């Protein structure tokens, strides 16, 4: 046999061995992944409804009890954000897996301990707008719903923004409750109120320009606030 033929034979013989090693590595990795999901799924199954296969409002209340947080606590909304949950009050198994894998937790105690850091993550400037917009979408409970009623808006905006901008939020909520022109709020108005809080000097409003592209709702709020301040 020539040297070239021998080298070719060696390459051919080594190919099955390499393939077998690769299969072995993939198999081991798959087992580790499956084991990780098994623990995560065990928690999910504790709270999930047996018929729907999802964690429903009753299950989330039980989860909150075990986590020792209130059902209306912002941490639960942030957890839903981490899972990228699509329907308010419900967690699918895929959403649950996504969230807990990202948090690197596989039991309730670890999940409970992760919540304070998760809150810090969501409130970082690089993440907050994404969380803020998610909060609005998450509360749109009906199919093709685009707007949120004013009462729900007031509750939500106080929850997600009130601790950062208490004066602006309190004043805006007061305005929303007494005005009669708007029964709902849309995403553009919601997004621009965050921009308002971040950019506009308050309460003097010296840099608010009605000629800029602000929603009429905010123009009306500014006009009302100036009259109230007199």
What are these regions (language model features)?
Residues 134-182:
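Conserved binding-pocket/active-site segment within a compact domain
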Residues 2-52, 57-60, 73-82, 87-144, ...:
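EF-hand Ca2+-binding helix-loop-helix modules
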Residues 115-121, 172-179, 208-219:
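Short amphipathic alpha-helical linker/capping segments at the junctions of internal repeats
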Residues 50, 66, 70, 121, ...:
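Surface-exposed polar/charged interaction patches
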Residues 55-69, 91-105, 148-163, 187-200:
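Amphipathic regulatory helices of Ca2+-sensor modules
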Residues 184-187, 191-230:
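C-terminal interaction modules of eukaryotic adaptor/scaffold proteins
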Residues 121-125, 157-162, 180-184, 199-200, ...:
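Eukaryote-specific, cytoplasm-facing alpha-helical/coiled-coil scaffolding segments in long proteins
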Residues 109-115, 149, 170-171, 204-208:
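Short, tandemly repeated low-complexity microdomains enriched for cysteine and small residues
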């Amino acid at each position: 046999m020539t040297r070239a033929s021998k080298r070719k034979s060696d390459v051919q013989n080594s190919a099955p061995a390499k393939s077998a090693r690769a299969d072995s590595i993939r198999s081991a990795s798959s087992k580790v992944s499956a084991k990780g999901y098994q623990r995560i799924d065990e928690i999910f199954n504790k709270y999930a409804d047996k018929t729907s296969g999802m964690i429903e409002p009753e299950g989330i209340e039980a989860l909150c009890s075990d986590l020792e947080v209130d059902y209306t606590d912002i941490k639960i909304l942030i957890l839903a954000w981490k899972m990228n949950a699509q329907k308010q009050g419900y967690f699918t198994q895929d959403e649950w897996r996504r969230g807990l894998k990202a948090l690197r937790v596989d039991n309730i105690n670890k999940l409970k301990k992760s919540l304070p850091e998760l809150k810090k993550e969501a409130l970082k400037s690089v993440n907050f707008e994404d969380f803020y917009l998610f909060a609005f979408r998450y509360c749109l409970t009906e199919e093709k719903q685009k707007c949120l009623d004013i009462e729900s808006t007031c509750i939500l905006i106080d929850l997600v923004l009130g601790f950062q901008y208490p004066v602006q939020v309190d004043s805006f909520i007061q305005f929303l409750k007494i005005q009669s022109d708007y029964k709902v709020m849309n995403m553009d108005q919601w997004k621009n109120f965050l921009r308002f809080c971040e950019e506009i000097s308050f309460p003097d409003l010296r840099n608010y320009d009605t000629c800029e592209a602000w929603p009429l709702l905010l123009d009306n709020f500014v006009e009302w606030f100036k009259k109230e301040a007199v």
